[in-house]
Amino acid sequence: MSRLLLAPMEGVADFVMRDVLTSVGGYDGCVSEFVRVTGSLLPARTYERETPEIRNGGYTASGTPMVIQLLGSDPEWLARNAAQAATVSPHGIDLNFGCPAKVVNRHGGGAMLLATPELLHRIVSTVRAAVPARIAVTAKMRLGVSDTSLAIACATALAEGGAASLVVHARTRDHGYRPPAHWDWIARIADAVRVPVVANGEVWTVDDWARCRAVSGCDDVMIGRGAVSDPFLALRIRGQMARQPSDAEWPLVLGCLADYLKKLRARIAIHHEHGRVKLWLGYLKRTWPQAAELHDAIRRLQDSAEILGVIEHALARIGQQSAPAG
């Protein structure tokens, strides 16, 4: 069976979301939201805040290995911070060359680096030299900034710079998250480099996963928004749940939501829990129409305890409806 990896998603796949989704099961690994590196050495408390998995040996509560992702554009500062991160991230260091966010790109980070393959090579080689050999250094990239003209050059620069593997998101920065994903370009990249390539982009269903593998030629797939829209997608791919979502699974989804909110409330460093739950419901609406109804029910609520009460009431009501008549 190929590997299934949970993608880093800034503002979405935080520590608690990683905990909940990997607890559902099916993932072989996950990557943190990016830790931004500028012109300083980050203190240890930054990693403790952003990636609490380090207190568990780099694993989520369910035992899924987590890799810390760094984002920046200065080779030396990235290397110094990677060396420090490697002391608490035994499963690897990932470098972000794919973030399309304007706030990141205007500082020359993320996907903007795909305009300069030589800088990509320098970053990866400098980081690789600074990190112990036992710690894998990997990279995540897109197909380019505005077009694919440098896609092969960028992938080659990363691989030759020392990246142990590449995750390729099959769109350019300018394409954002608009379909389609160009999985055929992943195949071209995989043919051009001598390191493993992981396919990423527009995998929402089991059928998407199968087509992605067939077109890209990659065994391993990283899933992002599809994992948030369907928490059971990895299990479906592995044949451990029904291939297609159904209304009968909605109580399980409510259980995931309740678990997520309870864990958010327990995290002192997390604020605005109500906004995060509403954000997740926005993704879930793609798979379950009931999510739209629940979103409407909590739309104006600001208190997380009230929202939890609505979720638990919905669960209780389903239980009453399914109970045999006495």
Swiss-Prot record:
MF-aspect GO terms: flavin adenine dinucleotide binding; FMN binding; tRNA binding; tRNA-dihydrouridine16 synthase activity
Binding sites annotated in the UniProt record for FMN: 8-10, 69, 140, 200-202, 224-225
Keywords, comma-separated and alphabetical: Flavoprotein, FMN, NADP, Oxidoreductase, RNA-binding, tRNA processing, tRNA-binding
Residues annotated as site: Interacts with tRNA: 36, 96, 177, 276, 278, 283, 299
Claim: Flavoprotein is one of the keywords in the record: yes
InterPro entries: Aldolase_TIM, DUS-like_FMN-bd, DUS_fam, DusC, DusC_C, tRNA_hU_synthase_CS
Enzyme Commission identifier(s): 1.3.1.-
The keyword Metal-binding appears for this protein: no
Catalysed reactions listed for this entry: 5,6-dihydrouridine(16) in tRNA + NADP(+) = uridine(16) in tRNA + NADPH + H(+); 5,6-dihydrouridine(16) in tRNA + NAD(+) = uridine(16) in tRNA + NADH + H(+)
Active site annotation, chain numbering: 99
Top EC class of this enzyme: oxidoreductase
Cofactor annotation: FMN
Primary role: Catalyzes the synthesis of 5,6-dihydrouridine (D), a modified base found in the D-loop of most tRNAs, via the reduction of the C5-C6 double bond in target uridines. Specifically modifies U16 in tRNAs.
Family to which the UniProt record says this protein belongs: Belongs to the Dus family. DusC subfamily.
HAMAP family, per database record: DusC_subfam (MF_02043)
Protein name listed in UniProt: tRNA-dihydrouridine(16) synthase
